[in-house]
Regions:
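P-loop NTP-binding core
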Residues: 1-253
Length: 253
């Protein structure tokens, strides 16, 4: 079986990207899907959010730089959910000067192993546009973009879509592309205005459930817990479970 490779990407920071990666993957795992999530950000926020605090453990850095297998570097962190940490050398990928265009194809080649049994491989990207993001985009089947409902995020989305179009042109294939509204404040007028603009330009590409802004989601990472462990049954946990169901069923606004 070939896993579906989902890149969680936004070149703007502070949009709930890692929060989405952590809680969506755990929700999918709770629904019985087999998931591997790769921390592809040298800051290692995803791994810390899942309770893996040893940032010196090798992970995807060893896969890309030394040819280790992904299976060797996978750590079971929850039922049905494996983690591949960033590793202390991941930042070296950005400084690679040898290999030409192959520098951007390291991850795709590492994921070609057909003996894996995951349903999904999620890649949590850094908020940048360098060699790491290029590797993720060359490997991706699908791109999931967390978005906040403010105008700066809207500007950043325009730039990101331009980047994605260039990769689609180079690969001669389209990505499956969807947006998730993160840190959404229903009572705020700007939230509704920005969502309306996004719906106009991306019809049928916004997952149906919005992730509402709550303090609980900001608190979880410091305890190394997902929202389902930190406050099971709360509004945010319900939001992420509904989002996971939207994701599986292709349910859009």
């Amino acid at each position: 079986m070939s896993a579906r490779i989902v890149v969680v990407l936004n070149q703007k920071g502070g949009v709930g990207k890692t929060t989405t990666s952590v809680n969506l993957t755990h929700a999918l795992a709770k629904l019985g899907k087999k998931i591997t999530v790769i921390d592809f950000d040298p800051q290692s926020h995803l791994a810390v959010s899942l309770g893996s605090v040893d940032t010196q453990t090798s992970g995807i850095d060893k896969v890309l730089l030394e040819g280790a297998s992904l299976a060797e570097q996978s750590i079971p962190v929850r039922k049905n959910l494996n983690l591949v940490v960033a590793g202390p050398r991941l930042q070296e990928i950005e400084q690679l000067t040898d290999g030409g265009a192959r520098r951007g194809d390291l991850l795709r080649r590492a994921l070609l192993d057909g003996n894996r049994d995951e349903d999904f491989i999620f890649i949590d990207c850094p908020p940048s546009s360098g060699v790491l993001v290029a590797n993720a985009l060359f490997a991706a089947d699908e791109i999931l973009v967390p978005m906040t409902s403010d105008y700066l995020a809207l500007q950043g989305l325009s730039h990101l879509v331009g980047t994605i179009r260039k990769f689609e042109s180079a690969l001669k294939r389209p990505y499956k592309f969807s947006l998730v509204m993160s840190r959404y404040i229903p009572a705020r007028r700007m939230s509704k205005e920005v969502l309306s603009v996004i719906q106009k330009y991306f019809p049928g590409q916004i997952l149906a459930t919005t992730i509402r802004e709550t303090a609980l989601l900001a608190e979880c990472p410091s305890f190394g817990k997902t929202i389902f462990e930190y406050r099971p049954g709360c509004r945010s946990a319900r939001d992420f479970m509904a989002l996971a169901e939207d994701f599986l069923e292709g349910r859009m606004m």
